[in-house]
């Protein structure tokens, strides 16, 4: 909105000074106008500067022109466009000399990185400055911000990718990790070899036991266990020797010699020493004549077949139990055969 030069302030002050216009406001002129005792001109509501009116009915002098009040013309734009009156003034572009802060403010050496959303918001604000920041302080989308001006509470070191000067920086953490693994192997290896005394001072990583040493320890532990097994077998054969015949002892010796081969290895518990065919035939023949033997007859049979009295007694007991079981099964089979389950 533009105003001509020859307009007098009377045209603006007339509605306020008129009797009809004054009725819309309070009788006192101070509600919309300052007193002109201190200043030559007063501030009118929404109209910038205007000559002060001491009384309500008194108007401005027609001889005065707007040229006498240059500040009044500067406020016409804001009076014409009310929205522009509340617009904030943007800062004028000015160069930044350096990134340093006054000594009273704490400064961090770490540069924090803004996220993608914050970079998009801070983009138009950065365009206000005519000169860019120096490269020493501004990296790739990085702005040095002190701790209390930090954009987010999270640590910036986690978001920032590490900039390593050379290959040595990468090798350092891997060497530390590698130093832990040989230590774990060193702790596990003595368990394979049996009881080994640990030294007071830990061994270095270069002194870890080689696989050949572990094999020798296992081979030493093997012969130690084998004599104990052979002694147990000999003790068992010694217990059975008075009750078994010479043929059975020979068969047991042959079995002991063949236990080393994995093809003939026996699984489960050790079976009893079986009777020979000749012994079983004589016992079966005697069982057919009489299932129960007297003491005298049992001693005679034991001498003839080279068995002890106790062995013959146990064989007859087992044979009777077997016969009883067979008779029970045959009886059940006969009973079930009479019924037709259809």
UniProtKB/Swiss-Prot annotation:
Please identify the protein, giving its name as recorded.
Homeobox protein Hox-C10
GO CC terms, sorted: nuclear body; nucleus
Q: What is its main location?
A: nucleus
Q: Could you confirm whether the keyword Ubl conjugation appears in this record? A: yes
The species this protein belongs to is Macaca mulatta
- As annotated, the Glycyl lysine isopeptide (Lys-Gly) (interchain with G-Cter in SUMO2) covalent link is placed at 106, 195, 254
What protein family is recorded? Belongs to the Abd-B homeobox family.
Concerning SUPFAM superfamilies, the annotation shows:
Homeodomain-like
